Amino acid sequence: MAAAGGGGPGGPGTGGKIRSRRYHLSSGRTPYSKSRQQQQGIISRVTDTVKSIVPGWLQKYFNKQEEEHDRVHSASEVIVNDTEARENNAEHHIYVVDDDDDEEGNSPTDGRVTPEPIINVDEEVPSTSQSAINNTDALTRPSLHRASLNFNIFDSPALNCQPSTSSAFPIGTSGFSLIKEIKDSTSQHDDDNISTTSGFSSRASDKDLAVSKNVSVPPLWSPEVDRSQSLSHNSSMTSKKPTFNLSAFGSLSPSLGNASILNRQLGDSPFYPGKTTYQGAAAVRSSRVRATPYQAPLRRQVKAKPAAHSQQCGVTSSAARRILQSLEKMSSPLADAKRIPSNSSLSHTPEKNVMDIPENPSKRKKVESPFPPVQRLVTPKSISVSANRSLYIKPSLTPSAVSNTNSRRIQPDKHNESRKNNLQTTSQSHSFSYPKFSTPASNGLSSGTGGGKMMREKGSHYSTKPANEELDGPVLPEIPLPLSTAALPSFQFSTLSGSATSPISVTKPANSTTCRLTSSSPSFTFSSPIVKSTESNAQSPGSSVDFTFSVPAAKASSATSDESKVSAVSRAAKTHAAVSSAKNTDDEQLGFCKPAKTLKEGSVLDMLRSPGFSSSPSLLTSASSLNRSTPTLSKTVGNTFSPANVSLGVGSKQAFGLWQCSACFHENMSSDSNCISCSALKPRPTETSKKLPASPPSSNTKSTVPLSSTPGLGDIFKKPAGMWDCDTCLVQNKAEVTKCVACETPKPGTGMKATLLIPSTTKSTNPATNTLAFASCSASIPNEEMFKKPMGSWECTVCHMQNKTEDNTCVGCKAEKPGTVKSVPTAAPSGLLGLLDQFKKPTGSWDCDVCLIQNKPEANKCIACESAKPGTKAELKGTFDTVKNSVSVAPLSSGQLGLLDQFKKSAGSWDCDVCLVENKPEATKCVACETSKPGTKAELKGFGTSTFSSGTAAPTFKFGVQSSDSTAELKSGASTSGFAKSIGNFKFGLASASTTTEETGKKSFTFGSSTTNEVSAGFKFGIAGSAQTKPDTLSQSTTSGFTFGSVSNTVSLAPTATSSGSTGLQVAAVIADSNLATTATLKSAEEKKAEAPTITPFSFGKTDQNKETASTSFVFGKKDEKTDSAPTGSSFAFGLKKDGEESKQFLFGKPEPTKVDGSAASAGFAFGVTNPTEKKDIEQPGKSVFAFGAQTSITDAGASKQPFSFLTNVSSTAASSSTCGVSSSVFGSVTQSSTPATPSNVFGSAISANAPAPSSGVFGNLTPSNAPAASSTLFGNVAPSSTPSGSSGLFGTAAASSTPATSTSLFGSAAKLSAPASSGGVFNSAAPAAPASTASSVFGSVASSTNTSANSANIFGSSGGAATAPGAFVFGQPASTASTVFGNSSESKSTFVFSGQENKPVTSASTSVTPFLFGAVSASTTPAAPGFNFGRTITSNTTGTSSSPFIFGAGASGSASSSITAQANPVPAFGQSSNPSTAPAFGSSTSVPVFPAGNSQQVPAFGSSSAQPPVFGQQATQPSFGSPAAPSAGSGFPFGNNANFNFNSTNSSGGVFTFNANSGSTTQPPPPGYMFNAAAPGFNMGTNGRTTPASTISTRKIKTARRRK
């Protein structure tokens, strides 16, 4: 760390201990003295190590060194006036530092490796800063004094904020730490009030934390600028946010620290200091705005203070100072405002080292203020800005930030003088005072900018250009257009250069240039280009002249001549104007294009309509003799205007050969004989019009029209004689037309009609009717004649429209002609006769007063609203009383009968008064709202309500309406459910609660509604329905339809309660009228009110509680339980055992409790749901909803029903034996009930019941029952039962029963029965049967029977445990039993066993085959061949047959040594430890583990404390997850199991692979079969895999990381 820097508290490691102030005048050290790194003690090293962990923005308070060895204190340099400084704390006195005394003035730079030479202005002698050698982090401590704000911030980088006690003016790049401010008593008092948060009132400012001078380990956190490579002043502009210092993990030399040359952090830019940022060096090179407007050179008075103490902050603790320092670094409005540049003299833009260009301050890194935000305000002081203030540039190779500081400490006159000299050399050729960048430093970086980004040598943008620099226009070659006018129209925008029209000549027929086919350009030009023909124009006849817009200073082509030019001006005209062609040549010497000197007049259309755009040679020829009608600028020497007295465009049209159609006034080419628009004939030319030459004229002749006859500019817009304006549409018409060409309005003034009537298709013989006649002023009509009324016309007094003489009525408003009898007009004046005739109302038609529809005269009623015709009797209609006007409304004249005929109402149709819907004549009610037809008896009803006239009324479609009816009579807005024979309505989001007792309605498709009446609801989605039915209707048996995932509870008030909770997706509904069995259809079903058994349809997750015997439909993995009544027909049951039991509906994940007393209720499809039946004489059990990870404890007399309890421990301690609770433990919950309860175990929960209760284990539950109960285990549950019960194990469950019961093992469940029972093992379930039992093992299940006379049907790889029963197929298991089924092993014949080992039975009369246990290890005293056990160990101590089905990662342990009748070998559920006594839930604290528990009697669950060995994370007696397994039988390949292969552990028994586990079992297992990842024990997290006996595994030793020196 820093070897020098301020005098810190002495004694390394002493912290903020108060010590006396000492003066350390460390002038004895040489500038190049080595750092004292080797002299550190142990305490200082510890302190340095602690400091290296602290980030750099906190280290600035650690890095105060004990003494300031790098500063030379001289009494002559310091004006010690402590009293004056304390009195005038706010005023900072300026003192002069002599440069002679400053030769060895040292200041901490910014932690660079090599000392930078400090160039003084007057001496240019490099003085070395010895603090720059090892001062790595002393620069990161800004002072907390606001007095340092009055520095030039340019000279005070944000990095170098350490207050210095040196009297010499520092030279380094530090500005905030140039002079150590001595705080007066006021500031100390302020600091005392700032924070006294430290526990001890230490003068933390006086006693900072002690640090050693040289720290061997660099700080872990350091500011960004500490790592910057450049020594330019811009390093101070980079942010001081803490960045990770890579040098803490090793650098070139420990003494270098983060000042190592190789210490370039990730992301540092090689071209400018700091990280690579957006915009690169441009972002770094930004102007800094000082906190105060003082400029360099700045002279400040140093207050005397003890040099030993680096900082005075009163009693502010170091932690408080760090907090305040962090606050200073944060962005604040005040800090942001300080960055805003100001143009006032108070805040003059400070000089930069290189250039004074103010840049965007938002790009600039934040210059931190080293003062806490709580001290006194620093007010800017006005300074006088010198006029000759310019930039001082030091032409040295040293970094400019170093050389800048010394140079600014000279006197102002010296400084200004030197800056003037430098300015003359650097920026003498520029008009602004911003010089170029200085010479790049020797390190490759630009010494002025801090960036070395690849930039131009000129680093600045010049705001002005020299006046003499003007861009010359490019000399463009004359490139002819390689296309001819035969393919393209010739664009000719030029008047020919050199043409000068005579002031007296009007038309000039061309002589010389018109004989050329190339001279095809019209004389009209835009004002900009002067087009000259090139050589290729004469070479290719018919080619258009090139035209180019003018470019300045272009040279003329030497090959141009008068003959090669396209000229519309004759040579005679040139001669008459006395224009020399030499002058034209001189004017055109500038280029082939020249700006026009006059603005040509005329229309663009005149040029575009010229024959030059036509490919006809005659037109091209004739176009060359143009009559220029524009006043052209004669190209004389004087450039005077000679306007030609030619009208605009008339002569040019004639010269172009255009003629105007007399019919449509379209201008046509001269070659067109007919108008191209209306096909009218071309009019014959008259003597007043110009003759267009059909061939090139051969002589220069003037036009025959005298100048006096040339029309003026106003004559152009005069109307030709005889033309008239339409009074209707104001379109100008020709004189010969009698109707307007636009609206066909007759010509006004019928008195002139006979004389002016000329067919529009004939050409005019009258000179006044010529289209070009408006060009001559002799045929012009005066303005008063133009607007004169036609003779005989009359003006309407109503609409002021001019009418013809023969019209007796106004053509616009139909008003009569004056002089006749007037009629009051009833229609609004429109004025368009021809247009209104099309919309004229037929005679006799009338408008409806109600809907304003026009009707035919013969119609007596309105065709739209059927209102009576005015004058007839009005008919009252419904709620709409038609308002009849006493005065008949005048018919409107704006109707169109033809269009309305399409929408005409059919005869006899009538509109509903309520909904305004049109109905057919034969309809007596509205088809929409069923309102009676007007005239019939109206019924009182609400708006839009349905009318049920019969029992079979159509259903209504209702959205979101909640209907509730409690009576059987029809109510307004009531739903149709509950009414006799009413077809179910489609209801969306509707909740209908109907408690009618007589009739039950059919309910159809319902979305999300809850129907709680006694009738079964139809298709319902996701709603819970709860209904209370009356005692008289409780005998009805209802069947719920397809319900999806809901629980329907029915609280019966009588033992005969019947509830139909349809809360899920009910597809079918059952009505209580018939015993119609409905399957999963959308049809409604009926069921009788009688107690006849009904079949419930497909239901998803729904529970129906019925007291009656009902056959349920498809049940997926659900156990059906019936108690007393005879079973009825059941539908498809997936994985369901129906043996004397009723079928339940398919319930998906929901418990379904049903009454048990009279008959078994039918439940729908139940996935993992138990349907326990209830006794009819017991109270209704309460239901607990889904409890995730909660522990439910029911102590009331009524047994509770816990549907889905994940990680919950459901314990029912009710002592009342009269209540039969229906508990449903779902997914790993343990339900312990000491009272007769019906546990429903779902997915890995263990249920222990000591009372007669139907238990239903679903998906990996263990349901041991010692009382008569119907246990139903689903999917990997173990249902051992010692009492007569119907157990059905589904999908990997083991159902063990010692009494005659029907057990169904489904999919890997083991069903063990010691009594005559029929066990059906399905899919890798082991069903050991009693001697008189028939075991049906399906797909890898083991049917073990203590009696050899058991009839076992092993299906697909299941092993029969009897001596005569074939063994089940165990994937990777030794084949030890005889098998006759595919994949089973037989004693006489061993079949193929995948990776299994054939094993013969040893000591047992009946060999049991462990089925396919995926990853489980089966350990029993009898050598049982373990099946495919996935991560699971099955241990059995029974001498009888032990069979475990497919258990996925679960451990099963039977600790009872008695026969199977007492305790069956349980088949654990998914990851569950099956203990016949108790099995805890996942996360519940019980005596038996659930999830991946070890095989012990009472192994606690995950995270629970128990006296038994823990399950998850501890070593149980049986190995848990990650603990060694001790299989006593042939074990399969335990993939990742704690088997015999001990990774890093000892194994006492040769076994299989065990990863980091210790197998403490002493039994020698047979050669292991394939056990895929079979680890029966639970996951022992952090138990080192040790069993109860101490293992030889040494515990891991975790070492803390230490950083090497």
Curated annotation (Swiss-Prot):
Gene3D superfamilies the UniProt entry points to: Zinc finger, RanBP2-type
Binding site for Zn(2+) 4: 848, 851, 862, 865
Alphabetically ordered keywords of this record: DNA-binding, Membrane, Metal-binding, mRNA transport, Nuclear pore complex, Nucleus, Phosphoprotein, Protein transport, Repeat, Translocation, Transport, Zinc, Zinc-finger
Sequence repeat residues: 249-250, 656-657, 943-944, 959-960, 988-989, 1007-1008, 1021-1022, 1044-1045, 1100-1101, 1116-1117, 1134-1135, 1148-1149, 1167-1168, 1188-1189, 1227-1228, 1243-1244, 1259-1260, 1275-1276, 1291-1292, 1307-1308, 1339-1340, 1356-1357, 1371-1372, 1382-1383, 1414-1415, 1430-1431, 1448-1449, 1470-1471, 1482-1483, 1502-1503, 1512-1513, 1521-1522, 1535-1536
UniProt zinc finger (RanBP2-type) residues: 655-684, 720-749, 790-819, 842-871, 906-935
Residues involved in Zn(2+) 1 binding: 661, 664, 675, 678
Regions of compositional bias (Basic and acidic residues) in chain numbering: 410-420
Start-end of Basic residues biased regions: 1596-1605
Biased composition annotated in UniProt, kind: Gly residues: 1-16
GO MF annotations in UniProt: DNA binding; nuclear localization sequence binding; structural constituent of nuclear pore; zinc ion binding
Keyword Zinc recorded: yes
Keyword Metal-binding: yes
Residues that hold Zn(2+) 3 according to the record: 796, 799, 810, 813
Pfam family of the protein (one): Nup153
Composition bias, Polar residues: 27-44, 194-203, 397-409, 421-432, 497-517, 697-711, 1499-1518, 1581-1595
Binding of Zn(2+) 2, residues: 726, 729, 740, 743
Cofactor(s) the protein requires to work: Zn(2+)
Origin: domain of life: Eukaryota
Protein's job: Component of the nuclear pore complex (NPC), a complex required for the trafficking across the nuclear envelope. Functions as a scaffolding element in the nuclear phase of the NPC essential for normal nucleocytoplasmic transport of proteins and mRNAs. May be involved in the retention of unspliced mRNAs in the nucleus. Probably mediates tpr anchoring to the nuclear membrane at NPC. Possible DNA-binding subunit of the nuclear pore complex (NPC).
Subunit structure: Interacts (via C-terminal domain) with the nuclear receptor kpnb1; the interaction occurs in a RanGTP-dependent manner. Associates with the Importin alpha/Importin beta receptor.
Entry text on domains: Contains FG repeats. FG repeats are interaction sites for karyopherins (importins, exportins) and form probably an affinity gradient, guiding the transport proteins unidirectionally with their cargo through the NPC. FG repeat regions are highly flexible and lack ordered secondary structure. The overall conservation of FG repeats regarding exact sequence, spacing, and repeat unit length is limited.
Protein name: Nuclear pore complex protein Nup153
Organism: Xenopus laevis
